[in-house]
Swiss-Prot record:
GO terms for biological process: tRNA wobble position uridine thiolation. The gene is mnmA. This is tRNA-specific 2-thiouridylase MnmA. PANTHER family: MITOCHONDRIAL TRNA-SPECIFIC 2-THIOURIDYLASE 1, TRNA 5-METHYLAMINOMETHYL-2-THIOURIDYLATE -METHYLTRANSFERASE. Keywords: ATP-binding, Cytoplasm, Disulfide bond, Nucleotide-binding, RNA-binding, Transferase, tRNA processing, tRNA-binding. It is found in: Cytoplasm. One of its GO terms (molecular function) is ATP binding. It catalyses: S-sulfanyl-L-cysteinyl-[protein] + uridine(34) in tRNA + AH2 + ATP = 2-thiouridine(34) in tRNA + L-cysteinyl-[protein] + A + AMP + diphosphate + H(+).
Amino acid sequence: MTQKVVVGLSGGVDSSVAAALLHRQGYAVVGVTLWLMKGKGQCCSEGLVDAASICEQLGVPHEIVDTRDLFQNHIIDYLVQGYGEGVTPLPCSQCNKAVKFGPMLQYAQQSLGIDKIATGHYARIRFNEASQRYELLRAVDRQKDQSYFLYDLSQEILAATLFPLGEQTKTVTRQLAAEFDLSTAEKKDSQDLCLIEAHGSMRDFLDKYIAPKAGEIVDLSGAVLGHHEGIHHYTIGQRKGLGIAAAEPLYVVKLDPVMNRVIVGDRQSAGSGECYVQRLNWVSIPEPTAPIRCEVQVRYRSAPVTVNAIPWHDQQIKLVFDEPQFGITPGQAAVLYDGDRVLGGGIICPQKSETAGV
């Protein structure tokens, strides 16, 4: 019996090749495109057209699933609230969990009677017989690896998901797109968040939802160096665009939403030897009850660094870095790795915890 699979199609080259590969391997493919953003002329419109074109070319059905309310509630509202509270949220991991994979699997199972889904993400999944857990791994192409954004997927979702591109490089993907003669073969990769593509910049997007609120830019002693029009325009570690003159380079060290202040200091002041992580999801291992030695990635393009991860109170972990790290940003994800294997991850806390660990 031919196995069926729902393939998430964004209209880009990666998801197009994922669908074409599975189709060539004998799967009965159903393309599904998520309608994410409200309003006409948004970024998703072109994607819908391109996804439909790919399905027509492959001779497979194409479905459109309306997830606009989910996207509004879980992404737009989440971003606006976070930036307003002085943190820098990571929308992509949140979107993968709450808007893309979960709803797509639910639609596949309940509306189509299909138990497998696939996407064009660069990551790998394997089943560990010893632990009886599905493990999330980095992609073969480390430059395109997207496991950082997928750490929050559940065991149920990993068990049902295929990543056809995980074992190949982006160069091979482009070659396959040409070989399949796909209509998206020459389409450029997206360089920004879909929100930025739709609104021009993150600043423009946030200004649409958050009213200007003037405040002070101060140094670590509290001396006023300048003024700002809203803390949502700033992020930890930021140097450019501060609008203040100083004898030495200054960086954003802290955002204080209570006092509506941007606190700046030298580069060393923007570094930290530890941070706390909440809203944890343990992927490839059960939740640890003792400290573990591993690597952590604290932003998408940063190199992994060695840490001690210590179980803490309130279902948090404390990360102690071997060397101080610059610009640890509350709201971003801290994803733990053992080599290529994603152990788990969570969201960096805005404040340090003071209670002793386990």
